[in-house]
Amino acid sequence: MANEVNIYSPRYLAEVVRQAPPVRTYFRDTFFTNVKPFSTERVDIDLVKGDRRMAAFVHPRLGGKVLTANGYTTESYKPPLVNPYDVTTADQLMTRLPGEDLYSGMTPAQRAAQKLMEEYATLNDATTRREEWMAVQAIVTGTIPIVGEGVNEVIDFGFTNKITLSDENKWGGTKADILGNLGDWTDKVLTGGFANVDMAILGKEAKKKFFADANVQKMMDNRRMNMGEINPRDLPNGVKYLGHLTDPSLDLYAYGEVYYDDWTNPEEPATKPLIPDNAVILISSHPNYMMAYGACTYIEQASGLWVTSQTSRLLRSYVEHHPDRRMVELQAHPPVSYTHLTLPTIA
């Protein structure tokens, strides 16, 4: 027999159970703290590469020596469009919404107002997840693939800082040198990227191989020297703190957030980890990367004129007929770009 609702029995709706995953934004909120909405379609970044030249010694009677400028390059990016929307039809407003009492007496207009808030939250969550995915892609691969209906391109930041271990040098191999790798890589970041790395974010398999490594276990068990501490604990925003190494000085983290990939193979969508299983990311905890938003341009319904808005989010609603329906859409142009260099690595 079907589980029918008896409208004559006293009932109480305790709550609406929404089985939706939380929105995790660790990479976006931690590393891309320099948020800048632009008023233009494209975002240009001038890159000035410094060096470690020192001022020359000169004789007092000879005068100074010119320290020549290094010059700069300009990178130009066109932020991709993210434009999710939802549709509300008249028949949806005539029936009870999730969480509404059977005899609430809500009018269609009141339901429309409540549904608008719920729709915006859904659209905003989807856009936020895309921003987090873009932030991770930029740091891990140095590229952001823009794949969707009518678009297939790649934003390439020109990274030359990816390292791939091969054969028995891989973590878990017979010639693996995990602690030596981390020391060499932090030195490489300091030399080539002018950044002091203090964090290592490990993928799932990289984390397993790190803790299973005999040299790591031996170092952690050395009671005569404080070479580090393993003290795993959960942190907000889906992050797990694993412990600390003293040489090289690194805090170790894992980030288990996943995303739903329905564009690589639309016939077989899959849930994938944001951080590749074998990845090791070395990064500064305060890089101040930029989140640069392009301008949002649309036709204003009342005036019929084109309007450009300098914002990270544009929420708009408009009406269509035959059948009558209200469209609610969110528009954003969210790329990510850099103010200086850091070197993630892949093991």
Language-model regions: role of each:
Residues 194-294:
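Extended oligomerization regions of viral-like shell subunits
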Residues 82-160, 177, 181, 187-206, ...:
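Long, contiguous amphipathic alpha-helices that act as assembly "spine/axial" helices in icosahedral shell
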Residues 33-102:
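Assembly/oligomerization interface modules of large self-assembling protein complexes
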Residues 165-183:
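Short N-terminal edge-element motif at the start of the domain
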Residues 1-43, 341:
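N-terminal alpha-helical "arm" segments
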Residues 31-56, 262, 280-281, 316-317, ...:
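Basic/polar low-complexity intrinsically disordered segments
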Residues 275-334:
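C-terminal structured domain segments
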